Amino acid sequence: MAQALSEEEFQRMQTQLLELRTNNYQLSDELRKNGVELSSLRQKVAYLDKEFSKAQKALSKSKKAQEVEVLLSEKEMLQAKLHSQEEDFRLQNSTLMAEFSKLCSQLEQLELENRQLKEGVPGAAGPHVDGELLRLQAENTALQKNMAALQERYGKEAVRPSAVSEGQGDPPGDVLPISLSPMPLAEVELKWEMEREEKKLLWEQLQGLESSKQAETSRLQEELAKLSEKLKKKQESFCRLQTEKETLFNDSRNKIEELQQRKEADLKAQLARTQKLQQELEAANQSLAELRDQRQGERLEHAAALRALQDQVSSQSADAQEQVEGLLAENNALRTSLAALEQIQTAKTQELNMLREQNTELAAELKHRQADYEELMGQKDDLNSQLQESLRANSRLLEQLQEMGQEKEQLIQDLQEARKSAEKRKVMLDELAMETLQEKSQHKEELGAVRLRHEKEMLGVRARYERELRELHEDKKRQEEELRGQIREEKARTRELENLQHTVEELQAQVHSMDGAKGWFERRLKEAEESLLQQEQEQEETLKQCREQHAAELKGKEEELQNVRDQLQQAQEERDGHVKTISNLKQEVKDTVDGQRILEKKGSAVLKDLKRQLHLERKRADKLQERLQEILTNSKSRTGLEELVLSEMNSPSRTQTGDSSSVSSFSYREILKEKESSAIPARSLSSSPQAQPPRPAELSDEEVAELFQRLAETQQEKWMLEEKVKHLEVSSASMAEDLCRKSAIIETYVMDSRIDVSVAAGHTDRSGLGSVLRDLVKPGDENLREMNKKLQNMLEEQLTKNMHLHKDMEVLSQEIVRLSKECVGSPDPDLEPGEAN
């Protein structure tokens, strides 16, 4: 059993140790690969961060600065347009006010003329001529009536005196006083009729002037109402434009502030992320440095342990068990180191997942930034639409201003027509004055005669006429006051018109500025459209390139997937083989456990037999001593001894011991027979330590005690070996479980890893690892190439070390097998101390 332990268990331990070493090397290689992948991913993340920061800076500098400049330029252009429109409106208002002042002065002149016509001022030539004309017309009509009445009366008087002279024959001297007596009364009537006709004519003229004045004032009031309505509309449009301008300015300012706030927030977030990434990189670098130190320390420890093992194996064979224990301890340490490496690997995988998540977050943030850019473009389109609406409003204002200009031209034409009509009136008045002068020259003579009578009649009528004139003057004053109130109202309206003229000028200035801004915006729109077309072309080119790259990457990934599937199939096959070997090992362990239990039972039975034999031997020794004493006392030396030996040989206790020792399969007699038949050492340590031929009479008490002591020592060694066997079985079971778990971890890691480790048929592990490193390293990075070369050199050194270690382990295993064989063959000299000495 000891030989089975030494060969099978140590062979199995050797294979397990080799497998553990290979797994350790594979895990270290995978750790290096993970480190390389992690460094490449960190470099990629750093490169992506740099590119992202550059793109963000470029976007923020170009777009936000351009938008701010565009908004500021739009603001300046709008302000310039407003100023120009205000100036134009002021100019138009000033021109309208000048024309309105001219109209007011003309109205005042017309009112003065009307007043002079009403008052009949003699200082003015025109009104004096009009008064004379009226008076002469009235006098002419009155004289015509008087002439007709006098002719009728004269005809009657002429007929009546002729009849009287014929009938009575009186002299004509008496008739003259009768005919001339009513002459003063006729003159008075003539004057009265003249005054009445003159008043009628004056009243008709006053009514005509009042009607014309009222028509003119109503027309002016209508024009003023129209102008006021137009000015109100223009003022409302101006207020609306002002509010729109303020809203646009506020919106642009708010947008600029929001863009600045977003920019600051983005910068803070980027700084925080960069700091976090730097901290993580520092922590990862520290962990990598610690892992490297640990790996170097473990390598040194392993090398020292191997050297110590070699020294111990070469120095003493008895230290083989201690070396086995050291190997087991080293195995446990390797397990712990493997567990630590697995934990480190899980931590690295978690770090890789974190980096991937950060990469996805960065991609999502890029998408978010693109969405913000699209929103800004939409806002730009909204601003362009608002600008177009403002341009439409400006066009409407221009149309309104053109309508106002047309109305102004119509007013000017009406004023010119009024002037022409006034000039025509003046010409007619001049003609009438000439006619009146001619009539005056004709009727002067008649007036000279009639004036005397008229003056007499005027004395009586003047009082009544003065009363009527006072009434007329009072009416005229009331009308003048009314006209003055109307003039005040018209002046107030003219002031309002001046204010409206200013607003119209301002609006015209705004319209001009808006026209300029319109041209500028059209140019900017063309430039923006050209830039957008260029950007679309560039984006299409980049999209084509990205698609091509994506297709190439997809092909590469498909190849990698195929290779990984092949590797997975190979790993599955290997796993099936490992599972089979593990099941075989478990079956062997069960067999060994069962065999050990059987051996323990056999050993316990042998112990019982030996104890019983010991008890019988003690009894026999007591009997022998008694017999010896009896023989000594009876002086029977030789014959007694021979009888004692013969009696002992034929004693029932001896036969009983032989019969009892035959209970177990490995009995004392069988061992003696095997030793006598062959020189091969016994394979069981549970056999009896008595290897001498049956000469119990020659054994002393000291030899029996020594034999029992040796038996106890061999039993203790057996127990120690059983404990070691149990420990090795437990360790082999735990190692099998570790192997299953690690194979599952390796399979999951191979499934999750993205590294192309495709190994062509017939290639070695070294070429496959070189291809993996070449796939990991990009052709453009010189630093990565140097790193790749260093890793390849380190890998070659490690492989050479592994080969030497394999050779050393084989030598050690052979030495351990030899020492175990020697240890198994060592109980024979222990059982015969005389020969060994």
Swiss-Prot record:
Residues 648-666 have a biased composition (Polar residues). Residues 678-690 have a biased composition (Low complexity). The modification N-acetylalanine is found at A2. One of its GO terms (cellular component) is recycling endosome membrane. Expressed in the central nervous system; especially in neurons. Keywords: Acetylation, Cell projection, Coiled coil, Endosome, Membrane, Phosphoprotein, Protein transport, Synapse, Transport. InterPro entries: GRIPAP1. Proteolytically cleaved by caspase-3. A minor C-terminal proteolytic fragment of 30 kDa is produced. Proteolytic cleavage is required for JNK signaling activation. Its main location: membrane. PANTHER family: GRIP-1 ASSOCIATED PROTEIN 1, GRIP1-ASSOCIATED PROTEIN 1. The record marks D594, G595 as: Cleavage. Residues 4-158, 204-637, 697-731, 781-810 form a coiled coil. Residues 161-180, 555-577, 647-666, 677-702 are annotated as: Disordered. It is a peripheral membrane protein. This is GRIP1-associated protein 1. GO terms for molecular function: guanyl-nucleotide exchange factor activity; identical protein binding; ionotropic glutamate receptor binding. It is found in: Early endosome membrane; Recycling endosome membrane; Cell projection, Axon; Cell projection, Dendrite. It comes from Rattus norvegicus. The modification Phosphoserine is found at S651, S662, S664, S665, S684, S686, S687, S688, S826. Regulates the endosomal recycling back to the neuronal plasma membrane, possibly by connecting early and late recycling endosomal domains and promoting segregation of recycling endosomes from early endosomal membranes. Involved in the localization of recycling endosomes to dendritic spines, thereby playing a role in the maintenance of dendritic spine morphology. Required for the activity-induced AMPA receptor recycling to dendrite membranes and for long-term potentiation and synaptic plasticity. GO terms for biological process: negative regulation of protein localization; negative regulation of receptor clustering; protein transport; regulation of neurotransmitter receptor transport, endosome to postsynaptic membrane; regulation of recycling endosome localization within postsynapse. Interacts with GRIP1, GRIP2 and AMPA receptors. Interacts (via C-terminus) with MAPK8/JNK1 and with MAP3K1/MEKK1; the interaction promotes MAP3K1-mediated phosphorylation of MAPK8. Interacts (via N-terminus) with RAB4A (in GTP-bound form). Interacts (via C-terminus) with STX12.
